[in-house]
Amino acid sequence: MELGPEPPHRRRLLFACSPPPAPQPVVKALFGTPAAGGLSPVTNLTVTMDQLQGLGSEYEQPIEVKNSSLQRMGSSESTDSGFCLDSPGPLDSKENLENPMRRINSLPQKLLGCSPALKRSHSDSLDHDVFQLIDQDENKENQVFEFKKPIRPASRGCLHVHGLEEGKDVFTQRQNSAPARMLSSNERDGNEPGNSIPFMPQSPVTPTLSDEDDGFMDLLDGENLKNDEETPSCMASLWTAPLVMRRTNNLGNRCKLFDSPSASCSSTIRSMLKRPDRSLEESPGGSRKRRKSVAGASPEEAASPEKPQEILHHQSLSLASSPKGTIENILDNDPRDLIGDFSKGYLFHTVAGKHQDLKYISPEIITSVLNGKFANLIKEFVIIDCRYPYEYEGGHIKGAVNLHMEEEVEEFLLKKPIVPTDGKRVIVVFHCEFSSERGPRMCRYVRERDRLGNEYPKLHYPELYVLKGGYKEFFLKCQSHCEPPSYRPMHHEDFKEDLKKFRTKSRTWAGEKSKREMYSRLKKL
């Protein structure tokens, strides 16, 4: 009766019970005769497969040594080739506790599974799952190896946070993706004192890491940080903590910068924003004498023991000088009460008028000037009648000059200006029928042209006035000073053609003037 092919379980049983065959050459084992047990050449080759080491080499090796060869050594070839997971052996377990090694980013973290550097217990479980059948069954070639399903790794942010809190517990074991031979040189240097490498948070932007990193980890940074990163307590306190209002006394400190510590802030602010008050004990005459002496004295004499505010006040007066050096009380008076060059106050008493930027005088003032009341103070008193010629011929103030065109006024006053002598003033008064439009416009024009022709604040005619109410009001109050003593209004029925002619001429000249000014401005640009 012929025997059929032997089942696989019987072949395992025969291998376990039969003694090891006698050592014979490899070629003989491959092509020799069947064994005494009646095994076929294929079965004999299967039995003696674990004894083959290479052609021409001896296979005399005990079974215990063969089994021990399956144990992982300090440098695992399977780890270096990337075919199997690896866990730290007895050679490098102590050194890895002192100097952790960064994993070479050869694959994305999700594909490598949970790194043993994060959880030691998980690495032990992986090692146990892979190598738990070594001691139970010696014939590993007939069993199929299955990798453990990888799980989601922890994010970098969590690794950094827990690594700082737990110390070296996170890096107690070497990561599987780094070969053991790469730790040989670094571990020896790390054992020396002063050569320990501190753990630093690493980023793929760093030049040293970009050379070795293949870019897989950058794809997972954003997702890991969104899901696993928690808000720090310091940031949470910004939303939950109550608001605290703190008032800083910056103004007080700024005020006390040049003051004594005992000085109050209110008095300092008052001294900064307000003009220094004059002492009640000083008389106007005494202060005037003191100012004159300081203005003409040397720097040594000016540094006399006085109040600091008075010294600053006197220095400002000495710096500002008029053509004759007679500017006084400039800080004690309102600039609006000073004439155009700020050298002195107005001579006449002014009244309120239609235009606030101009000074108006009453008809009685002009009457007093014509009567010679201010002869010792005035060198020249000029009255400019800005009405049209037919109005001027119908009645005007004695001594007035009829100039209704701006170019005529500029030719009369500014081409050959009147120079004051002996401290006497030159006063110019403008008026029209009501002193509401033509007179004020002519007064502004003269001041504007005078400013352009002189260095500020010097002026040829610093004192200008406008007659309040115009010629109509002057005629009603002071008819005796009018020649002829009559009044002809602008809208007279007999002079409609003259009115139309002069108005057209004035508007045309005004338009040409505006064009000339526009051209001059364009040339300056």
Curated annotation (Swiss-Prot):
Post-translational modification here is noted as: Phosphorylated by CHEK1 on Ser-75, Ser-123, Ser-177, Ser-279, Ser-293 and Thr-508 during checkpoint mediated cell cycle arrest. Also phosphorylated by CHEK2 on Ser-123, Ser-279, and Ser-293 during checkpoint mediated cell cycle arrest. Phosphorylation on Ser-177 and Thr-508 creates binding sites for YWHAE/14-3-3 epsilon which inhibits CDC25A. Phosphorylation on Ser-75, Ser-123, Ser-177, Ser-279 and Ser-293 may also promote ubiquitin-dependent proteolysis of CDC25A by the SCF complex.
Q: Where is this motif: KEN box?
A: 140-142
**Single GO term (MF):** protein kinase binding
Keyword terms, alphabetized: Cell cycle, Cell division, Hydrolase, Mitosis, Phosphoprotein, Protein phosphatase, Ubl conjugation
Q: Which family does it belong to?
A: Belongs to the MPI phosphatase family.
At what positions is Phosphothreonine found? T508
**Low complexity bias: start-end ranges:** 294-306
Domain Rhodanese, chain residue ranges per copy:
377-483
A single Gene Ontology CC annotation of this entry is: nucleus
Question: What protein am I looking at?
Answer: M-phase inducer phosphatase 1
Spell out the InterPro entries in the cross-references: MPI_Phosphatase, Rhodanese-like_dom, Rhodanese-like_dom_sf
Reported function:
Tyrosine protein phosphatase which functions as a dosage-dependent inducer of mitotic progression. Directly dephosphorylates CDK1 and stimulates its kinase activity. Also dephosphorylates CDK2 in complex with cyclin-E, in vitro.
Among its keywords, does the record have Cell cycle?
yes
**Assembly information from the UniProt record:** Interacts with CCNB1/cyclin B1. Interacts with YWHAE/14-3-3 epsilon when phosphorylated. Interacts with CUL1 specifically when CUL1 is neddylated and active. Interacts with BTRC/BTRCP1 and FBXW11/BTRCP2. Interactions with CUL1, BTRC and FBXW11 are enhanced upon DNA damage. Interacts with HSP90AB1; prevents heat shock-mediated CDC25A degradation and contributes to cell cycle progression.
Give the matching Pfam families. Answer: M-inducer_phosp, Rhodanese
Superkingdom of the organism of origin? Eukaryota
Q: Which residues form the active site?
A: C432
